[in-house]
Amino acid sequence: MRKIIHIDCDCFYAALEMRDDPSLRGKALAVGGSPDKRGVVATCSYEARAYGVRSAMAMRTALKLCPDLLVVRPRFDVYRAVSKQIHAIFRDYTDLIEPLSLDEAYLDVSASPHFAGSATRIAQDIRRRVAEELHITVSAGVAPNKFLAKIASDWRKPDGLFVITPEQVDGFVAELPVAKLHGVGKVTAERLARMGIRTCADLRQGSKLSLVREFGSFGERLWGLAHGIDERPVEVDSRRQSVSVECTFDRDLPDLAACLEELPTLLEELDGRLQRLDGSYRPDKPFVKLKFHDFTQTTVEQSGAGRDLESYRQLLGQAFARGNRPVRLIGVGVRLLDLQGAHEQLRLF
């Protein structure tokens, strides 16, 4: 049985701003772009979240919810440096590390000799060291697979630890609301509710075939998650192929015009994610992904196209024309050139 830890820093960017400027502590704080330039919230303090402010929200909306919100421009050089320090701590326990972002990672400690192989004690020690050495907090989840470890890390946020043992998996998953499953947004949850499915226990009552008929290949994934099954390995040093931002809408967007209205906010968030990349990648082909109301999806990309609003408008128009029906999800992204991988290939010759 595997032992997987999911580590997630608590409001990472905001935590570092408060660490480096004590006058910000205890304040409603958001890190992100200017509200005058369609800026979005990269992250925010828990004091800001109490007002309803959330990551990826338009900064203008955030300020309406919390007029006293303090807005700080991001310092990605600082965030990258601290992320490297956190990963150095991880490597003291295992080399099997899969980074998801600057502030989030999976660790496979199945074969780790530390603390007699106790994943719980390893997670406790990582949390202690990050707090003592870097003066920020992280939350951790321990479980037999990645799906459950990620859910566990969110269970007692902030500054928490939650453990799901192999013996607890079946009962824990049975009580989970289907909305907790990866890929299940509000629209899918409502669709499942109309089928009488609200928990994973409800999902288990049906057959895998019926879910596949209703949701396509996603139905098979749903069935596996409802049974606590996730065989995905921790992918060590997996090089990124792309950077993207996706949004699943509470209500399907009825036409192309409605889809186009969502582009500026999505592109602002995409630009923020691109800024967080290290220098071993170079942005290449832009792409747009659409998922229609019937769960069919399409992706359009174009070599040589720019990454400006007009280029994405054209790609979105092409993607919409392939389905020409209401849209439940829009994704925008960029394929990446792996400069590090290319350099390593050259060295081989």
Swiss-Prot record:
Co-factor binding comment: Binds 2 magnesium ions per subunit.
Cofactor(s) the record lists: Mg(2+)
GO molecular function, a single term: magnesium ion binding
Catalytic reaction annotation: DNA(n) + a 2'-deoxyribonucleoside 5'-triphosphate = DNA(n+1) + diphosphate
Active site: E104
Gene3D superfamilies according to UniProt: 3.30.70.270, 3.40.1170.60, 5' to 3' exonuclease, C-terminal subdomain, DNA polymerase, Y-family, little finger domain
List of residues binding Mg(2+): D8, D103
Domain UmuC: from-to ranges: 4-185
Chain positions of site Substrate discrimination: Y13
GO biological process, one term: DNA-templated DNA replication
SUPFAM superfamilies assigned: DNA/RNA polymerases, Lesion bypass DNA polymerase (Y-family), little finger domain
GO cellular component: cytoplasm
Entry's transmembrane regions: none
Subcellular location: Cytoplasm
Classification via PROSITE patterns: UMUC
Pfam family membership, one: IMS_C
UniProt entry keywords in alphabetical sequence: Cytoplasm, DNA damage, DNA repair, DNA replication, DNA-binding, DNA-directed DNA polymerase, Magnesium, Metal-binding, Mutator protein, Nucleotidyltransferase, Transferase
Annotated function: Poorly processive, error-prone DNA polymerase involved in untargeted mutagenesis. Copies undamaged DNA at stalled replication forks, which arise in vivo from mismatched or misaligned primer ends. These misaligned primers can be extended by PolIV. Exhibits no 3'-5' exonuclease (proofreading) activity. May be involved in translesional synthesis, in conjunction with the beta clamp from PolIII.
The family this protein is said to belong to: Belongs to the DNA polymerase type-Y family.
Assembly and oligomerization: Monomer.
Entry-linked PANTHER family: DNA POLYMERASE KAPPA, DNA REPAIR POLYMERASE UMUC / TRANSFERASE FAMILY MEMBER
Protein name from the UniProt record: DNA polymerase IV
